[in-house]
């Protein structure tokens, strides 16, 4: 009899633990693998997880959590290449060739790690949150930090992130001489042509402000709109300051202005099943054509809400509490890459 009583007490305790810890908060339920495809961009693959640091259950009023993510092609480098092949002013100032191109390129694999805190209101109908993240691009060694704030009330979500580049970027140049041909239509060999190569890379600082909404009887749907702004996206590629003032005063340069500096991103995500969600959206930089994107996401565990095989709503807890372990929304890293290639021909006695 005593053994039976002890067994029953143990069972009740285990049941209580399961109820309070909320089985939907299993680590796998907060770990996702995703694939994103966007116009004019390389496919982006990532794995992301959010985990509470301390014990969290349905009686907790606050949570401290860590969030980590590793992404292939986890950011964009706005690249500008300037090229000029010319003669010094003293030799006539002829420009043989000049070219300027701008493009977007992947910055490669990135990693991010963040720490966050969220606290529910007294009635559990809203919560406020704050978070800090560190981002790193492994190939280019770009570094960025961010500070974010959140406010969730009912189905409505408001968030803002402020991004700060770490370091002043990198810049380098080299000047050397070599023999090479004067371009067509001259096609004449020349000697001691001065070649100047310059490179400058820097990470953008900035901010984004977003609004998202879920729906009471269709909690598997989430719509959002996000406004972003980037600083440090302007620059100039120009002739290196040669020791010869005749060359420096030639004043060839290429301005790079506001490359994808401001824009709006909007979209919708749908949990189709407890394991699979799909999303689609539109990214519209001001002054540039917009780009569509689609995203598929696989949850290692299960999402609580889903169109098929999951709940559509939940009255057992407030909406704010059910979102306490949702992932922080942030923008990918942005960078500017300026490259200059200048060839300068001097007058020579043999050509006089």
Give the ranges of each region predicted by the language model.
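Transmembrane beta-barrel domains of outer membrane proteins
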Residues: 50-54, 116-120, 148-152, 210-214, ...
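Flexible, glycine-rich linker and terminal segments associated
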Residues: 8-23, 166-224, 230-237, 251, ...
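Membrane-embedded beta-strand positions of outer-membrane beta-barrel proteins
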Residues: 33-35, 66-68, 98, 130-132, ...
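Outer-membrane beta-barrel channels and translocator barrels
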Residues: 54-61, 120-125, 153-156, 216-220, ...
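Residues that define the transmembrane beta-barrel architecture of outer-membrane proteins
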Residues: 29, 41-47, 62, 92, ...
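Extracellular loop and loop/strand-boundary signature of outer-membrane beta-barrel proteins
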Residues: 33-36, 74-76, 80-103, 133-136, ...
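Short glycine/proline- and aromatic-enriched beta-strand/turn motifs that initiate or cap beta-hairpins
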Residues: 8-56, 63
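Transmembrane beta-strands of outer-membrane beta-barrel pores
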Residues: 35-41, 70-76, 102-104, 117-119, ...
């Amino acid at each position: 009899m005593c053994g039976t009583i002890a067994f029953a007490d143990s069972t009740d305790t285990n049941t209580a633990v399961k109820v309070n810890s909320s089985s939907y908060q299993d680590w796998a339920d907060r770990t996702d693998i995703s694939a994103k495809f966007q116009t004019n961009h390389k496919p982006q693959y990532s794995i992301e997880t959010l985990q509470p640091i301390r014990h969290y259950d349905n009686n907790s009023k606050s949570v401290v959590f860590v969030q980590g993510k590793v992404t292939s092609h986890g950011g964009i480098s706005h690249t500008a290449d300037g090229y000029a092949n010319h003669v010094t002013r003293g030799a006539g100032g002829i420009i043989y060739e000049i070219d300027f191109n701008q493009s977007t390129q992947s910055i490669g694999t990135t990693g991010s790690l963040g720490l966050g805190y969220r606290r529910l209101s007294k009635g559990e109908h809203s919560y406020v949150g704050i978070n800090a993240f560190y981002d790193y691009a492994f190939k280019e060694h770009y570094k960025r930090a961010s500070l974010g704030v959140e406010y969730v009330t009912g189905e409505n979500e408001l968030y803002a992130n402020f991004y700060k580049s770490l370091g002043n970027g990198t810049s380098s140049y080299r000047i050397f001489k070599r023999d090479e041909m004067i371009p067509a239509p001259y096609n004449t060999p020349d000697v001691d042509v001065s070649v100047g190569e310059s490179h400058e890379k820097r990470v953008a600082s900035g901010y984004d402000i977003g609004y998202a909404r879920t729906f009471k009887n269709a909690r598997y749907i989430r719509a959002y709109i996000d406004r972003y702004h980037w600083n440090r996206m302007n620059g100039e590629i120009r002739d290196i300051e040669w020791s010869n003032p005749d060359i420096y005063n030639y004043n060839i340069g290429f301005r790079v202005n506001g490359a994808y500096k401001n824009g709006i991103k909007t979209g919708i995500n749908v949990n189709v099943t407890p394991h699979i969600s799909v999303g689609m959206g539109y990214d519209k930089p001001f002054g540039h054509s917009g780009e569509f994107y689609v995203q598929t996401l696989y949850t290692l565990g299960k999402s609580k809400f889903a169109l098929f095989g999951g709940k559509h709503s939940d009255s057992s807890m407030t909406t704010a509490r059910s979102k306490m372990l949702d992932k922080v929304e942030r923008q990918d890293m942005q960078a500017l890459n300026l490259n200059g290639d200048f060839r300068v021909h001097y007058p020579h006695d043999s050509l006089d």
